[in-house]
Amino acid sequence: MKYLAINLGPIIKTFSMARKPKEFWAASYMFSYLMECILAHLQKEKNSLELISPAYEKENKERKGNEENPLVGVGLYPDRAFYAVKQEIDINSLLEDALKSFAKDIVLDVDVARNFFRIMTVCQEYPSSSEAIAGLNKALDVLELNQVAWDSDTFDAILKYLRKANTNLPLYKIAFNKDYYSIGTLEEIARANAKQIDYSYQRYVCIVQADGDCMGKIVSSKQMDGKLNDFSSRLIAFGNDACQRIKAFGGLPIYAGGDDLLFIAPVCGTDGKNILGLIGEIDEKYQKIRDYVDQLKVEDKIDEGGKTKTVPVHTSMSYGISIIYYKYPLYEAWEIARNMLFSNAKQVPGKNAIAINLRKNSGSDFEVVMSKSLQIHYNLDDLIRFTPKESFVSAVAHKIRANEQLLGVLPKEEPFENLDKRLNAFYEKIVDVAAKSADETTYLLKTKDTFEFIYKDYFIEKKRKAEEAKENKKEYREATIEEDMKSIISTFFSVLRIAKFIKGEEVKDE
């Protein structure tokens, strides 16, 4: 049977034009609404096309809202759609009609829309919908690599249109049923409605890019045949729930298409919780998706020692978080968040991870990558809760750094014999736990547990990478002990600094 895939662009190029949250939101919403217009026009051709994904209803309750659940005001449609082709059809003519309708609705010159937006299509034969999704996604990935140059008039017209987000924009009427909708500045989002600035984090915002793990394997699995439309409906409902929670926190949802989330949020929200607490609540909303996938018993085949092995596939959410000063360029912050997600969090074994980059206005840069299923995730929560005054945190970090060589003689292979006892002795003799107050002692013990975990995890991962390289016959340069310790201590210091920052540092001139 023939299958059709549709892909929209240029998303990244459009986002690069945005300077303010309003413009960032508008850039995202345009693509979601364009997809909605395409789905609406193709729905009229049910005899020729059968929609596989995403789910679409003429009166989409998730986007339209009701009295109990007002308009979400965020794009809920992804940039790709998939159809089964039941009989030949002039798809280009239908897409042209959809584009004209889109341009009319958002009050954009149709020639500008035609010249700027890329509506890419691929139509190929496949034996099943699951195989079609896998194959068509690869084909679309290749199509996206083809760059298109725009003339200056088209570029300027889109830029001018996005700037309208600061006054009146037709997209507001579509998204919120209002002629104008107030979207806060980065400074306003950072403050989270606080009347005065008491902590430095109130001058910083979080740009968060999140993505469902193993989703490619899931949607292209045999177990998903005939169920993709229902699954898409569940993902849209999740996106709606996540957006409502982000808004309640004081954040701004930018995009919620399927398992993909993009939003801007304060470090600490209007409800008193911090950004990690918000992520925990989004994960709770995602639990329904996890349960659904587990019920389907999705499987994948992997090669293990030259033999094919069938393993269950589970899903979770991974996050890339860029914490930046409110005057930092928004697009660059988004690039950092994307890099933290796809180059860091998604590379953690088992995924289900958070990767945080804190870029201080002073120029300091701190990064932490952690699995939510491992102890360091809970250690960070504890460190935030028990972090004492600034000078004490710096003193602990200094003690660790000053004794790098001493710590370098600790055991480096499992089962890490006597590591706990030797670290206890180090903290008693060098860090001087006994001389501290009860709160400071609690904090120190938390830092010891954190260091121990980071230390063990580093060498376990180092061994895994070496074995993987050997198995795949690839070159592998083993780091020296000095390099090992510098990396471990750098990660440890970043965890302490990020915990202290989220807990609340004194306001300084920045």
Residue ranges and their predicted role:
Residues 1-510:
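Regulatory and interdomain segments flanking nucleotide-handling catalytic cores
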